[in-house]
């Protein structure tokens, strides 16, 4: 009743709504789905994989419709949209699915790994560390989460700051040992990414978690230039 005076648009996937996504395809590179915009069904493709991406796209479509934006412009915009460091796929010559995500808490790591696990046909390879001079209690928890969900985990550094990087990875390792998860420890993050890329195929998905959009890595209290997108491209050459 509180909304009856207002012009409300609902959107959804499973439940009845004004704007509904149907015939959804989720791959490790994109999602696509059908949705009615104005008076006809349109096929929408979004270069951010995951079911959550469908919901976000539907919300954007609802707003764009209210603003009178044409279906053609909506389709083009959703195809091109990228959010730096959030489920961001890195284009590369090897055509390996490599995703950069800012996940740096137990909850966010669990969310991204579960999301990619649901649609990846091959292995999910998780590469992550934990920040230094921050809550050390979450380190074994994140190790346990990755060990439970990912097919293979490479424990590495994030921003060690003033802490010993080895001590941080040891604490993460305590958690992963509670699981049956396959893993290895590679303290140097660039070397860890190289290891992940060596073992991956085009069916797999590598999740580089924690750094996201940050352009630096902080070691011994000093910030060094570090952009994960550039690192991936430099490794491939």
Name these PLM-found stretches.
Residues 2-7, 29, 38-39, 49, ...:
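ATP-dependent carboxylate-amine ligase
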Residues 9-14:
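Short beta-strand elements of ligand-binding domains
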Residues 15, 25-27, 81:
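A short catalytic or substrate-binding loop motif that flags glycine-/basic-rich loops and adjacent residues
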Residues 18:
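A residue-level signal for beta-strand positions that form part of recognition/binding surfaces
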Residues 24-43:
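Acidic-glycine-rich active-site phosphate/pyrophosphate-binding loop
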Residues 43-51:
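A short glycine-threonine-serine/GTX helix/turn-capping micro-motif
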